[in-house]
UniProtKB/Swiss-Prot annotation:
Protein name: ATP synthase gamma chain
Membrane topology: Peripheral membrane protein
Pfam families tied to this protein: ATP-synt (PF00231)
UniProt cross-references to NCBIfam families, sorted A to Z: ATPsyn_F1gamma, PRK05621.1-1
MF-aspect GO terms: ATP binding; proton-transporting ATP synthase activity, rotational mechanism; proton-transporting ATPase activity, rotational mechanism
């Protein structure tokens, strides 16, 4: 059994770590609330854009944009949203496992996969497993802006425009609540069919000014940008929630470990006292 002094040192070490994890839990809780506000502010725009694009996809269009037409799939692209920092439980690895499973489905069919990474954890992971990372952006912090995301989005859209990609997906964690974040893979291009029954049973005719091509080019790009930005802010809220939960679990585990060490310390101290008493009694008997 370890000595009392060694056990006291371990208890002090765990207590210091517990203070750090408790502080990180409180910081993550504060950041999560701000991230939720940012996510809630951006959702109406993203959802409205999705509805408008859904109307266009089911409308009687004068001009059929390439983003609305299916192609034979030879290469697919993924915009992958991960975190820049760790200590957020299984948030990243669960997302990566889901993506790897889908990529395997494509590669088994002879389809190649390109990756545009948002977040340093995704960059390091997919570089280590041999993924084809064609673009990346890292270090966006807790307040990401659309201008920081334009690089990877532009690379993937250009590849799609030039026919080097036949499908484009966004991969991110969807924020459900504090305890639940779901890894999701959503198709961006070509525009997926809507599940809205109203859209399926109605058609819209549009008049375009100045011309449908210019309008659709701009509108569809804004749609992709809005969905990517929404994915980033949802992933950020998921990150802070996962970190808060992970740090709370670490703090609670620290408390349990301290109780166990305290019990071991008490036993060691009791054994030491018993030994001293035995030695005193033995010494007195010898006299």
């Amino acid at each position: 059994m370890a000595g009392a002094k060694e056990i006291r040192s371990k208890i002090a070490s765990v207590q210091n770590t517990q203070k750090i994890t408790k502080a990180m839990e409180m910081v993550a809780a504060s950041k999560m609330r701000k991230s939720q506000d940012r996510m809630a502010a951006s959702r109406p725009y993203a959802e409205t854009m999705r509805k408008v694009i859904g109307h266009l996809a089911h409308g009687n269009l004068e001009y059929k944009h390439p983003y609305l037409e299916d192609r034979d799939v030879k290469r697919v692209g993924y915009l992958v949203v991960s975190t820049d920092r760790g200590l957020c439980g299984g948030l990243n690895i669960n997302l990566f496992k889901k993506l790897l499973a889908e990529m395997k489905t494509w590669t088994d069919k002879g389809v190649q996969c390109d990756l545009a990474m948002i977040g340093s954890k995704g960059v390091s992971f997919f570089n280590s497993v041999g993924g084809n990372v064609v673009a990346q952006v890292t270090g966006m912090g807790d307040n990401p802006s659309l201008s920081e995301l334009i690089g990877p989005v532009k690379v993937m859209l250009q590849a799609y425009d030039e026919g080097r990609l036949d499908k484009l997906y966004i991969v991110s964690n969807k924020f459900i609540n504090t305890m639940s974040q779901v890894p999701t893979i959503s198709q961006l291009l070509p525009l997926p069919a809507s599940d809205d029954d109203d859209l399926k049973h109605k058609s819209w005719d549009y008049l375009y000014e100045p011309d449908p091509k210019a309008l659709l080019d701009t509108l569809l790009r804004r749609y992709v940008e809005s969905q990517v930005y929404q994915g980033v802010v949802e992933n950020l809220a998921s990150e802070q929630a996962a970190r808060m939960v992970a740090m709370k679990a670490a703090t609670d585990n620290g408390g349990s470990l301290i109780k166990e060490l305290q019990l071991v310390y008490n036993k060691a101290r009791q054994a030491s006292i018993t030994q001293e008493l035995t030695e005193i009694v033995s010494g007195a008997a010898a006299v």
